[in-house]
Amino acid sequence: MQSWVNKLWYQSHPLRFALWPLTLLFGAVSWLRRLLFSLGLKKATKLPVPVIIVGNITVGGSGKTPTVIYLIELLRSHGFKPGVISRGYGVEIEGVRSVLPEDKPASVGDEPAMIVSRTAVPMVVGAKRVDAAKHLLAEFDVDIIISDDGLQHYQLARDIELIILDGERRLGNGMLLPAGPLREAAWRLKSVDQVIVNGGIAQSGEQAMLLEPSKWLPVSPVHNGSLPPSQSQPLVAMAGIGNPQRFFDTLQALGYCVEQAQAFDDHSAYSETALNELANGRLLAMTEKDAVKCRDFAKDNWWSLAVDAKLSPSFDKQLLAKIDRLVADK
């Protein structure tokens, strides 16, 4: 299914024209909804702390989660106490709930489980981001909120908007859903504080971001000491993210011998049986987001590759300066 959609959105597939009427309808509804908020006919809830939205205008993975982790670490290093809110994609959450280190991705979502596992940040998930943000402020000592996704969730007033763009895919065929991958039209890029480009070539006015591999982590929490992958050792690679090929290309660029590469749909659920069959006793390499879903049944020779987002000092300086102004005005 995902490969078919990729052909439709990122290649010149003729079916996109058949979907044009639905795209017009989607665009009209999206425009009207934004207009109601901009005119004040629908009210956005303002919070007593700065709110940073990390989102995108395309469907699928673009690098939001590594960016959120980068911001958490940046803000902490400058004395802030960040908290994070998220929808918890792919799970049904009644009301809101705090994300705990022991929570399973099936209960809170893949990205929230990974973010809390990596950073131990205070985090709340819920379909209504305003409610999630209020719960976060009530339950935790937080002085700035990062919203993982939620660019189109206009009920929550925001102080800073960051769009993360896949530098290789960019806007695909440039069409709105369902004919293309866009949640909002391309003009939205000009209305945000920063457009962060993950990989590829950043255009004028955009911020370049690199995802740098940092280290191999054992998937199993009771790892028994097997060695991490080496370039001379054949491995099986798997990825269930927005752009699996990016992970496979990274492994090959690092010099690893990828004997087999298996792409899964984003947010796929994994079974012990299926992954045992895939690995067949061989070393299995996966992304951090996949790893949080495999811990309960992982074998000793299953490893995940941690990546760190890297942004320029000028980005950090501009962002922190704006946050300081916001804090002074709150």
Curated annotation (Swiss-Prot):
Keyword terms of this UniProt record: ATP-binding, Kinase, Lipid A biosynthesis, Lipid biosynthesis, Lipid metabolism, Nucleotide-binding, Transferase
Binding of ATP, residues: T58, V59, G60, G61, S62, G63, K64, T65
Cellular component terms per the entry's GO annotation: plasma membrane
Disulfide-linked positions: none
Annotated metabolic or biological route of this protein: Glycolipid biosynthesis; lipid IV(A) biosynthesis; lipid IV(A) from (3R)-3-hydroxytetradecanoyl-[acyl-carrier-protein] and UDP-N-acetyl-alpha-D-glucosamine: step 6/6
GO molecular function, one term: tetraacyldisaccharide 4'-kinase activity
Entries under HAMAP family matching the protein: LpxK
Cross-referenced PANTHER family: TETRAACYLDISACCHARIDE 4'-KINASE (PTHR42724), TETRAACYLDISACCHARIDE 4'-KINASE, MITOCHONDRIAL-RELATED (PTHR42724:SF1)
Protein name as it appears in the record: Tetraacyldisaccharide 4'-kinase
Organism expressing this protein natively: Shewanella pealeana (strain ATCC 700345 / ANG-SQ1)
Lineage: Bacteria, Pseudomonadati, Pseudomonadota, Gammaproteobacteria, Alteromonadales
